[in-house]
Amino acid sequence: MREKKDALVVTFAETTQAMAVETYCHANGLPGRIIPVPRAVTAGCGLAWKAAPADETALTAAFLMAGLDWENMVVLKI
């Protein structure tokens, strides 16, 4: 079985928010990728953004500057 590692998981209330974050991050070279929401988290839509926990500050600042919305940001072992 694969060893679980800490990951920053960003959840969204709506799928359109997740898609906007994915588009913005890819266009601006920000780290992470879209994943299905882990079972340990509840979210409005079934998609989440996964990145390294060390990227939390940079992603939060970028999302705020771009006016992107998210529901929750947590660090989980996944």
Predicted regions and their residues:
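Short, flexible, solvent-exposed loop/turn segments with mixed acidic/basic and small polar residues
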Residues: 1-2, 35-40
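Short glycine-/aliphatic-rich beta-strand segments at the starts of folded cytosolic domains
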Residues: 2-11
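Small/polar loops that bind or transfer phosphate-bearing groups
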Residues: 10-13, 51
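Short amphipathic alpha-helix segments
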Residues: 14-33
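A generic "binding-loop/recognition-motif" signal
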Residues: 15, 37, 55
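A short linear hydrophobic-aromatic micro-motif
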Residues: 31-37, 71-72
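Short, charge-patterned binding micro-sites
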Residues: 39-47
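C-terminal structural segments of small proteins and small subunits
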Residues: 50-78
